[in-house]
Amino acid sequence: VLFDRARSGCPGVIWWCGGAHRWCSFTVAGAVEQHGYDFIPESERYLSPRQLGFFWAGINSYQFFFVLGAGAIALGLSLVQAVVAVVIGNALFTLVAYSSIAGPRAGLPALTLSRAPFGVLGNRVNALFTWAMSLGFKTVNGLLGVFAVLALFERLGWHHPGAPGKVLATLVVLGVAIVIAVTGHRLLVRVQPFFALAIAVIFALLLCHTVGDVNWNWHPAHAPSGTGTIALVFSAAALVASGSLSYLVVSPDYARYLPSDTPVRKVFWRVLGGGAGMAVYLGVTGVLVATRTNLSDPVAGVEPLVPGWLYVLYIAACFLGSISNNASVFYSSGLAIQAISIPLKRWLATALDALLALVAVLLILFVYDFETALNDFLSLVNVWAGPFAAVWITDGVLRRWQYDAHAIHTSDASSRYWGLGGVNVRGIAAMACGMGTGLLTINSPLLHSWLSARLGGTDLSWFLPIVVSGAVYALLAGRRVRGEVRAG
């Protein structure tokens, strides 16, 4: 049976459907998703916990976590210390898994339900920050994919691709991700298991070919001691944690198609197992490989270690990983544009966002240094993302993830979530306290805080602001929110 474009609502998209029902259900992926940042009715919630777990494994199966693991070695840690930093940094994924519960319980994406603690207008600032952060990650992911395609061009004989090659590689990498994101949630969920399996196998082959020569006693030439070692471990953990923190602002987006009665433990363990498991696996692989070679170029740096056929597969894994993650980032970024109150449908917002991402990637390729841009960007993610997430998650726990779906989409003073002049001062104040804590405790290439210097360079900006913002919001708004829940 052919699922034609007239029935799919997606011009030009035709899917082959076999006899089995499970393949027939795939044809629905051909239709462009019409939902945006609105409520998902129970009748349209098709997702299963198992699919959600594979989804998270897929979006985390990209080179970024491999690069972060290698970065821990580059900071001057020993092999064991770098592995510890990777594990500690990814421990924040427990919060990502827990916050995903909001998806099925509320049926809303993060930037809709966060109107409750920040106010309808106040939350637009968070939507703008979310979009800006997603633009940064799309740029990083896109660049990793572009480097892979350029390496493939070299293997195919195009030894000096120059500007035309860079532009072509950028269009290919971003183009595939954009098509998936514009199509929507179902297609995202369907393709991620294939990305996860292919990339996991390729990195396993890479590990098998390199593990025999890993320097298990790796120590830097000038190893720090005492508080210096602790400071470096926490700095590396902060870089690794930026990946988990970035998901805290979008985690319900992907889980909101789960039925509302999905058991909490299934949501938590599927997200944790799929997402954190893949992130730790790739991060530790990056640590091990970095003891053997310089990975400042994360694609070409692997070439001397492996046979030609495996290097080509590694290039493919980097390319696929860039697409797998960027597709999901483009998806949530489109929701963020809607949450800013720009009157566009989700797929149009995503298409607009794609043009801006294209400009950003080309700007880094031709103007700025990638490594410097990456470090500066990651150092700033932690300052805002953690406090924002802490407030909306604390608010959700206080109200038991119960929201008035009509009122939360009302954009005037009649909404129960309007606040004072459209702003919930309690939520903004709690987030500001957390951000202030982050600025006081950060130690990064871009910012060196006073308190971090007094602590020997220890970076606490990746978890302490979360604790502060959550505690302050519970103190300021706890009684009021619980009263709203009791009043119905």
Please place each PLM-identified region on the residue numbering:
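Membrane-interface "cap" regions at the ends of multi-pass membrane proteins
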Residues: 16-79, 231-237, 256-264, 480-488
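Juxtamembrane transmembrane-helix boundary signature
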Residues: 85-117, 128-142, 478
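Hydrophobic transmembrane alpha-helices that form the core helical bundles
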Residues: 123-158, 322-339
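Hydrophobic, membrane-embedded alpha-helices of multi-pass small-molecule transporters
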Residues: 47-65, 207-213, 223-289, 308-327, ...
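Transmembrane alpha-helical segments of multi-pass small-molecule transport proteins
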Residues: 127, 155-183, 197-208, 240-251, ...
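C-terminal membrane-solvent junction of multi-pass transporters and transport-like membrane proteins
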Residues: 198, 388-472
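Hydrophobic alpha-helical segments and their helix-loop junctions in multi-pass secondary transporters
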Residues: 147-150, 155, 197-222, 240-245, ...
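Membrane-water interface regions at transmembrane-helix termini and the short interhelical loops
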Residues: 73-75, 101, 117, 125, ...
